[in-house]
């Protein structure tokens, strides 16, 4: 006898949001998904170069190893 209620609930129309804006609908085990980056705003696909440093990782690395940024 197989176990009952083993598989998660499947949402065929799960909504994907990026910055509060509806991006697409997909099938998922969650009814809503929130993403930070998707192909519409990723630099590889858009051709733009921008640096996402949400936690100050670059500055922390520079301080840790005593490096200074030279803008010249």
Swiss-Prot record:
Keywords of the record, alphabetical order, are: Chloroplast, Plastid, Ribonucleoprotein, Ribosomal protein, RNA-binding, rRNA-binding
Entry keyword annotation includes Transit peptide? no
Which family is annotated? Belongs to the bacterial ribosomal protein bL31 family. Type A subfamily.
Name of the featured protein: Large ribosomal subunit protein bL31c
Subunit info here reads:
Part of the 50S ribosomal subunit.
The record's Gene Ontology cellular component field reads:
chloroplast; ribonucleoprotein complex; ribosome
Stated role? Binds the 23S rRNA.
What InterPro entries does this protein map onto? Ribosomal_bL28/bL31-like_sf, Ribosomal_bL31, Ribosomal_bL31_A, Ribosomal_bL31_sf
Q: Which GO terms describe its molecular function?
A: rRNA binding; structural constituent of ribosome
User: Where is the major localization of this protein?
Assistant: plastid
The family database entries (SUPFAM superfamilies) matched by this protein are listed as:
L28p-like
Name a Pfam family for this protein. Ribosomal_L31
The compartments listed are:
Plastid, Chloroplast
Q: Name one GO biological process term.
A: translation
- The residue ranges crossing the membrane are none
């Amino acid at each position: 006898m197989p176990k009952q209620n083993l598989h998660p609930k499947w949402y065929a129309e799960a909504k994907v949001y990026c910055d509060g804006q509806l991006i697409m609908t997909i099938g998922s085990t969650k009814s809503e998904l929130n993403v930070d980056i998707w192909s519409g705003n990723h630099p590889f696909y858009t051709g733009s170069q921008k640096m996402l440093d949400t936690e100050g990782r670059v500055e922390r690395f520079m301080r840790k190893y005593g490096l200074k940024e030279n803008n010249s």
